[in-house]
């Protein structure tokens, strides 16, 4: 018999794979996914809201400086003071967004035009939660035409209408 390089190598029994290692790896992977998915969703949600507020802030500041904020209600246009525009901004920026989504099909009862191509529209919409039957849906369109909006149970259309009415009364007073 001719000796070869592999003549002295002896193969033992095949190794059995350790199931505990695979179980541990699977458990670590599952826990990582359970932690990461909600975390990433939360970060995305926060960044989306930050973008909304930042765009609205820039539009409010530009309209305040140029004194060009216009409200459209029931087809009528009326000027809005910078102070009222800032109050509406503070209300919108202070809201906790409920559900992000698309605006209702019907025309908005109140639309604020900031004069730079951006608008903020308001609708009273039914909500899915049981804490409040209706809430306010805000839809912001920035000067580039990008739009985003959400509903919130913390504010209603009557509150926005009241602010605009008070502002109009102040402007009309001698």
Task: Give the positions of each predicted feature.
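Function-determining sites in protein domains
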Residues: 2-174
């Amino acid at each position: 018999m001719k000796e070869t390089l592999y003549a002295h190598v002896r193969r033992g029994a095949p190794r059995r794979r350790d199931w505990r290692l695979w179980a541990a790896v699977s458990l670590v992977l599952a826990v990582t996914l359970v932690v990461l998915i909600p975390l990433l969703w939360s970060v995305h949600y926060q960044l989306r809201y930050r973008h909304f507020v930042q765009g609205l802030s820039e539009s409010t500041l530009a309209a305040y400086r140029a004194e060009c904020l216009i409200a459209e209600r029931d087809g009528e246009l009326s000027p809005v003071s910078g102070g009222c525009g800032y109050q509406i901004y503070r209300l919108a920026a202070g809201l906790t967004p409920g559900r992000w989504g698309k605006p209702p099909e019907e025309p908005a009862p109140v639309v604020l035009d900031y004069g730079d191509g951006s608008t903020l529209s308001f609708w009273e919409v039914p909500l899915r939660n049981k804490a409040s039957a209706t809430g306010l849906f805000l839809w912001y369109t920035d000067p580039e035409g990008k739009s985003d909006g959400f509903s919130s149970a913390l504010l209603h259309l009557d509150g926005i209408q009241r602010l605009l009415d008070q502002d109009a009364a102040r402007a009309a007073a001698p």
